[in-house]
């Protein structure tokens, strides 16, 4: 009997030691990851200081930071646990329902990775920088909006008003005149979360005239009615949806993406709030996918 107890005790000790070793390895990996993030934040902060008076430059710097950080996180071996990924996907599928399959594959990967990273960081008692969690979720949001507000919108305009012949009829968010007065398409990489309020017409650039803005609104309404949203919405409901998207995206961009570029600006509470807002409670991204065609 005593031998069985001793064997059981030894087996339990080995299991606890294995768990402890795994947690130690995970903490070490997270610390290395945090170090990489901090160096990227320091580099970004120095660039932001240089371009402090240039809003376009600031947006470009913040977008570059988001891209680099997301790429670094997706490459981390820490986030490849099959069990954690499977559980994260189950939760996300429950949240999105049938719309989970309508998300782009890159968006699904961003969301799964964000949830796994959050769970891994919660298991470590130290106060950590949760910037990566927010950036990954926001990259998923950006991927869905980029496809619809830039790619699909551009294709819609090209179909109805070919750029080569009717560029003047395009909305200002998709085209501009160069220094020689020639019409040019806006480069695809110029689309960022920071540009979404302009695409939704909740913000209008100062240089856009009232007449040009009216044309922008006509183009946007036509696209939203025929392509962007599910069929049968009234014009009032379409504008209500566009306004909500523009304002919600501006909110998360300022509160989470922009702050994530600074060291220790995003802690556990902020990351939890971001996840709640986009996925778990207010479900902004879940709502968008229901409204999109």
Where is each model-derived feature located?
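Nuclease catalytic cores
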Residues: 131, 138-146
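Extended alpha-helical heptad-repeat/coiled-coil "stalk" and oligomerization rods
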Residues: 1-72
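Charge-enriched, short contiguous segments at helix-coil
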Residues: 218, 223-293
């Amino acid at each position: 009997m005593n031998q069985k107890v001793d064997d059981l005790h030894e087996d339990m000790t080995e299991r606890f030691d294995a768990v402890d070793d795994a947690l130690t390895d995970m903490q070490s990996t997270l610390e290395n990851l945090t170090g990489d993030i901090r160096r990227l934040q320091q580099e970004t902060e120095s660039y932001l200081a240089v371009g402090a008076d240039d809003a376009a430059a600031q947006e470009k710097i913040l977008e570059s930071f988001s891209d680099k950080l997301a790429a670094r996180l997706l490459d981390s071996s820490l986030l490849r646990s099959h069990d954690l990924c499977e559980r994260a996907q189950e939760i996300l599928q429950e949240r999105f329902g049938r719309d989970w399959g309508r998300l782009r594959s890159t968006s699904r990967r961003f969301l799964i990775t964000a949830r796994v990273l959050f769970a891994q960081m919660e298991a470590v008692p130290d106060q950590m920088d949760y910037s990566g969690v927010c950036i990954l979720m926001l990259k998923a949001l950006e991927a869905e909006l980029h496809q619809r507000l830039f790619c699909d919108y551009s294709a819609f305009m090209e179909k109805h008003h070919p750029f080569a012949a009717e560029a003047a009829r395009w909305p200002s968010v998709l085209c501009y005149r160069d220094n020689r007065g020639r019409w040019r398409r806006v480069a695809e990489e110029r689309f960022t979360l920071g540009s979404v309020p302009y695409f939704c017409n909740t913000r209008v650039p100062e240089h856009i005239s009232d007449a040009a803005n009216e044309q922008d609104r006509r183009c946007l309404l036509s696209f939203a009615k025929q392509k962007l949203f599910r069929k049968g919405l009234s014009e009032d409901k379409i504008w209500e949806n566009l306004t909500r998207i523009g304002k919600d995206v501006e909110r998360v961009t300022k509160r989470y993406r922009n702050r994530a570029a600074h060291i220790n600006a995003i802690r556990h509470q902020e990351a939890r709030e971001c996840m709640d807002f986009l996925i778990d409670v207010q479900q902004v991204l879940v709502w968008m996918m229901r409204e999109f065609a």
